[in-house]
Amino acid sequence: MNFTAKSVPYQETGYFSKLVSDYLNEKDFLRHFYEHPVSYEGIEAAIRERELFPTDRHLLVKVLKEQYAGISLEDAVMKNLEALDRNNSFTITTAHQPAIFTGNLYFIYKILHVIRISQTLNARYTDRFFVPVFYMGSEDADLDELGYIYLDNEKLLWETQQTGAVGRMQTNGLEKIVDRIEGEFAGDPHGPELIQMLKSCYVGSENIQQATLKLLHHLFGRYGLVVLIPDNRLLKTVMRGIFKDDLTIHAPYEITERNNRLLEELYPVQANPREINLFYLKDNIRERIDRKDGKYQVNNTAIHFSPEDMEKELANFPERFSPNVILRGLYQETILPNIAFIGGGGEMAYWLEYKPLFKHYRVPYPVLILRNSFLLIRKGWKSKIEKAGLSTPDVFKPEEELMENFVRSNTTRQLNLDKQMTEMSGFYQSIKNISGAVDKTLEQHVEKLETQALQKLEELEKKILRAEKKNHEEVRRKIHEIREALFPLENLQERVDNFIPWYAEYGKAFLDQILQHSLALDQMFIILEENQ
């Protein structure tokens, strides 16, 4: 398989926020909220800062090797694990919760983006080494967001009554979805390989985070991707000081709140800090910690601590404290020798809140890079787009705009009344002159009559256009069909579809193609047209 790539500015797709557009355009107002530009100069500055920070590399590598125990490691992963123990190595990181079967396509895209950036930097800076890392948000408890996939717009839901951190959940019940996938894709060229991979990873694993680790290693291990599960006692010992600050003096709350007040002058704030930005994580519980009447209360439970007992709990069991979105990035950047973070638009918004928090704790702030986005167009749809008289970038436009453009370009009839409106304005001007000569106060009355008349003509013009559109209903049907196929559930394809149909058809060649067309530091939306 192979694709032809075209690129479109993110701003022209209509699917990205003003904040994202302004960040990509390096608007002056936002410059205060991040540290480094998305450029090689920004990368080099991030490296210099990171070299001064005492990352515990030995601890990191020890934990990673323990997490990979029992998995037959790809040579590229082993090489990268060994490299992380050296001071001249740095990570390029993306993060996501362990959505079942990788969830949406963008999960795959963001991983391939960190791999592409690492490859690019390794070629450019031969005296340093760059490792792609997937930081698994396995402590997230939002099963509603993580427990399903879409196949052909059908929602396949994991039916389970488990609660708490999704990464810790057992995989019971997922075999039903695997069976459903097998029934549909077993006959595809790479269907048997796909089914065996899913069964091995999910049916044969103790929990979701282990299943996700195995799946990502199977898919991306040959590229050297290192997967980190931060739900770990040893790693969290490094954070005890910051966690204590959060529990007692609420420094993260106060710092982030001040920054957000500045940010919200122009943009909606993505996440508001709480006085305590930690969850209590134990067994099947992940609940918010609140402070009430001088005691700490674990929300929705009978668990509570005195200040003294909470201090002991943190000292003895740091693994029971789970950072929320405000502290998650700080935890990530404390334990990894990281220089760049790749995330989606929502993640960019989170990270723009963090900079003062990083400054306060003297943790290096990474280069923020918007993850790559793709629209995949199969060869059959490419042909239909051309027959409808559209170019591939046109498909981002709303249906009505596409229809109007087609009608205006393909009709022999006059559809606008611009000439008539100009003539009418002249007509009313002459009446205004006549009446004004008699009584100046009549001019205002004539102006109102003109406004009303022009509005009536504008309404008529719209009716003429609507009537002409009805003469091209077949074109409308084709445009709707194209938009429905490329933008499932009226959303970007990457936010709905899963990688499974593509992998069943093309296997790892699909991943190779996405990687080949992935941009490194350039920031454009990529359209991939499947070639005949």
Residue locations for each model-derived region?
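Long, compositionally biased intrinsically disordered regions
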Residues: 1-3, 215, 219-305, 312, ...
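A glycine-rich helix N-cap at a beta->alpha junction
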Residues: 150-177
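Short acidic, glycine/serine/threonine-rich loops at helix termini
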Residues: 105-106, 143-149, 238-243
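N-terminal catalytic cores of NTP/NDP-binding nucleotidyl/phosphoryl-transfer enzymes
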Residues: 89-122, 343
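Glycine-rich phosphate/pyrophosphate-binding loops
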Residues: 104-105, 118-142, 366
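A translation/RNA-centric and nucleic-acid-associated enzymatic feature enriched
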Residues: 269, 274-339, 345-356, 365-367, ...
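A structural-propensity feature for long, helix-poor, extended segments
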Residues: 143-150, 376-408
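Low-complexity, highly charged intrinsically disordered N-terminal segments
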Residues: 14-75, 276, 457, 461, ...
